[in-house]
């Protein structure tokens, strides 16, 4: 296994402030995008819904952005920049061991590819907000299509990276929940994006609804990125947490690892005992006088033993035989 993380177990504890700093990036992106969508929907609803026979019901988000560029452009800029920085923070946090340390080289490649495509998606989001569909209709929808594709590619890279991480952290319920929800969101989002593009010319009202659904699904996905960086907040309980056991302080050995106990002594057929380590050998000097108490395993039996006496020319006649009486 290719390890990108150190195996030192003496890493000092990090301050809680840095955990909030990391999670701040996806949180700002999520709040800015979600609040912006709600504000634009509220403006459309309070302004008589801009409902005319030629406009879809509800109106396209792009149309709302074209008439509220003073709000729509900062909304897209803040969302896009912090969305890109979120992937940078995730990759750095994994390399530094603040969250799940990297287990394979492919995770590093997927993480940086997600950051690269996230930067491209953020650029397209900012560009489509500037080139609105009222004055630059063709260019605007090209940027919109590029943004949707790049955002899904970035999300797919992040999902595959998390899928690879679940192999080394199967005990992490947080990691597993994040992966499952992201996978469901990206599948539903792709279906809605296809419906949005397919209904754009003939059924504009339905197409606009799918556009709003895709936007809110992307908002939920950004919220899940906050969940990915949440372990950085719990540095005190990280070593003993059951779902982050392996990656506590950038170590490859779980902090709760307990060495196995020595196996019990095995009883041999001749009655002797064989112990796994010399430290477990009991003091049997009194029972076995030839055993050494200071050096286990060393015998004090003399090298030359006295020979047994041998009797030659035994006179069989000297032996006596006792006859037991036979009862009649």
Swiss-Prot record:
GO terms for biological process: lipid metabolic process. The keyword Cell membrane applies. It is found in: Cell membrane. Residues 41-69, 131-142, 200-213 are extracellular. It is a multi-pass membrane protein. The chain crosses the membrane at residues 20-40, 70-90, 110-130, 143-163, 179-199, 214-234. Pfam families: Frag1. Keywords: Cell membrane, Lipid biosynthesis, Lipid metabolism, Membrane, Transmembrane, Transmembrane helix. Its main location: membrane. GO terms for cellular component: plasma membrane. The keyword Cytoplasm does not apply. Residues 1-19, 91-109, 164-178, 235-328 are cytoplasmic. May control the production of phosphatidylinositol 4-phosphate (PI4P). Belongs to the SFK1 family. This is Protein sfk1. It comes from Schizosaccharomyces pombe (strain 972 / ATCC 24843) (Fission yeast).
